[in-house]
Amino acid sequence: MKAVICTKYGPPEVLQLKEVEKPTPRDHEVLVKIHATAVTASDCIVRDFKLPFWHPIGFMMGIVVGFSRPRNPILGMVLAGEIEVVGKKVTDFKPGNQVFAFTGTRFGCYAEYICLPEKSKARYPGDIPSVMTFKPSKMTYEEAAAIVYGISLALYYLNKGAVHTGQHVLIYGASGAIGTTAVQIAKHHYGAEVTAICSGANAELVQSLGADHVIDHTREDRLPAGKRYDFVLDAVGKKKTSPLKLACHQALTPNGKYLSVDVGNPTLKVEHLLLLRELIEAGKFRAVIDRTYPLEAMAEAHRYVDTGHKKGNVVITVTRDEQKVS
């Protein structure tokens, strides 16, 4: 089968398309034919692993993903595809089922096939288990692959922030994969009033997703006078600072919470994907895809994501089979 291999850490050029052996599922595993995956920020961080191993985060990351090179040379954390073979002890899936999944630190999605356990649990400290369920019938494989990463982080932080109906929520970096998901979940699931911070070029996009107010960070360095927020989600992370981000810290209510996506250890549960599928079927959630690349152009896709200017998600089409969308 074809797979994109990463045998050392570095720039996008370390990603190489190769022919590798097609995996065979064990008794509790399924073989998934991958139709689409996505290039996430986490994929790029792993590929370009730069933290020194003496640094606490660098050491822990080395344990999880590999010190001198990726433990699994096939990166990629999200997929949408079709089950081709099931192990003899698998009970919930059968050949022909269309699924979408988050493979966590198992990675392996930059390939035509992957074996995943029917049910997964952490294998060692810091490991993020895989999660898989049936693909939303109203979505293409590309759309389904696009939404998995955002929900894995957005829902974790919104839950941690105890967001609920009527609260004022501020999302900094609202036009990326995490931000576009957080806007929709905060508005349509939790019933919050949502203020989105993004560039003016993306204002129309985030408003169409449900944002009640939009602040253009390229033109504003302060928040509306007197406005206070119950929850602020920094969907960009601490690596980027600005006067406007500082103002977000200062605009919390007395019991307000500020959370950044680069702090914590998010885990995705099957229940999260089921909630997402429910919102999709009800027309309350949609995928946001910026660009789509073929598997052969993986390095180019990584270069684009590295710019930090993508809107929503960058998707990789792995298999171009026809698919039915109801």
Model region roles, listed by residue range:
Residues H272-S326:
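C-terminal hydrophobic helical "lid"/dimerization subdomain
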Residues R26, K94-P95, T140, H164, ...:
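Residue-level recognition of short, solvent-exposed, well-ordered loop/turn junctions
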Residues E21-A38, L51-T105:
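Glycine-rich beta-strand-centered segment in the early N-terminal region that forms part
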Residues G66-V78, V85, Q98-G173:
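NAD(P)H dinucleotide-binding glycine-rich loop of Rossmann-like/cofactor-binding domains
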Residues K94, E143-D216:
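Mid-domain Rossmann-like dinucleotide-binding core that forms the NAD(H)/NADP(H) cofactor-binding site
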Residues K2-V4, Q16-E21, K33, G81-E82, ...:
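Residues located in well-ordered beta-strands
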Residues L170, T195-C198, E204-N265, K269-V270, ...:
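Glycine-rich cofactor phosphate-binding loops and adjacent beta1-alpha1 units
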Residues G96, A111, G166, A211, ...:
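Local beta-strand N-terminus motif with an aromatic residue
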